Curated annotation (Swiss-Prot):
Keyword presence, Iron: no
InterPro entries attached to this UniProt entry: Tropomyosin (IPR000533)
Domain notes from UniProt: The molecule is in a coiled coil structure that is formed by 2 polypeptide chains. The sequence exhibits a prominent seven-residues periodicity.
GO terms for MF: protein homodimerization activity
Native species: Portunus pelagicus (Blue swimmer crab)
The protein's name: Tropomyosin Por p 1.0101
Residue span of region Disordered: 1-21
């Protein structure tokens, strides 16, 4: 009996120990599953990263291929450009040599042209000298006499225009004086009419003592005032017209003075030409 109890206790202890080991193994299994999940996640992430790296590698290789292709094209273009530069340098050298030869020929031709031009100028000068010497003194005198006649005609024409301008200026000045006199007369008449009007006004005031006579004479004085007023307006109109006439005459005087100055300048120029012609005649 005791042996059975001991065996049962021993079995219970083994059971408890087995339960503990089972719990421990279950916990270890859970932890192993967690580590396995983490490992799978890391593997998945690594696979994604490897795929990205492979894609990046493909792009880099493609870019490298394009870069190599462009580099080869640029190398070819550079080689072609270097060949063209060498050809252009050879052509420039040939052109420079041709230019030097052309400049030498041009200098030679320029020298010959200058000598020929000098000889031609000398021949032309000698021809003109001979032609000038071949002119007779009589022909030269005829030409000078014609110039003298023309100068005298111009001088006479200038004198005539000067006299005409002076006459017009005198007439304008006379008209201006008469206009000024008429204007002064008009102003005096206006003063007289104003004084007469003032006297009439005073008379009207003094004649107001008699109402009946004043009424009878009022109409007469009104008519007289109206007449005087009309005369005053007419005098003012004549004065304004005279003033406008004076302004117009002043403008005409200014214009004639300008014309007189121009004619004097023309007369002086003609006189100078005439004096020069006389001097040339005196020299012969």
């Amino acid at each position: 009996m005791d042996a059975i109890k001991k065996k049962m206790q021993a079995m219970k202890l083994e059971k408890d120990d087995a339960m503990d080991r089972a719990d421990t193994l279950e916990q270890q299994n859970k932890e192993a599953n967690i580590r396995a999940e983490k490992a799978e996640e890391e593997v998945h992430n690594l696979q994604k990263r490897m795929q990205q790296l492979e894609n990046d590698l493909d792009q880099v290789q493609e870019s490298l291929l394009k870069a190599n292709t462009q580099l080869e094209e640029k190398d070819k273009a550079l080689s072609n450009a270097e060949g063209e530069v060498a050809a252009l340098n050879r052509r420039i050298q040939l052109l420079e040599e041709d230019l030097e030869r052309s400049e030498e020929r041009l200098n030679t031709a320029t020298t010959k042209l200058a000598e020929a031009s000098q000889a031609a100028d000398e021949s032309e000068r000698m021809r003109k000298v001979l032609e000038n010497r071949s002119l007779s003194d009589e022909e030269r005198m005829d030409a000078l006499e014609n110039q003298l006649k023309e100068a005298r005609f111009l001088a006479e024409e200038a004198d005539r225009k000067y006299d005409e301008v002076a006459r017009k200026l005198a007439m304008v000045e006379a008209d201006l004086e008469r206009a000024e006199e008429r204007a002064e007369t008009g102003e005096s008449k206006i003063v007289e009419l104003e004084e007469e009007l003032r006297v009439v006004g005073n008379n009207l005031k003094s004649l107001e003592v008699s109402e009946e006579k004043a009424n009878q004479r009022e109409e007469a004085y009104k008519e007289q005032i109206k007449t005087l007023t009309n005369k005053l307006k007419a005098a003012e109109a004549r004065a304004e017209f005279a003033e406008r006439s004076v302004q117009k005459l002043q403008k005409e005087v200014d214009r004639l003075e300008d014309e007189l100055v121009n004619e004097k300048e023309k007369y002086k120029s003609t006189t100078d030409e005439l004096d020069q012609a006389f001097s040339e005649l005196s020299g012969y």
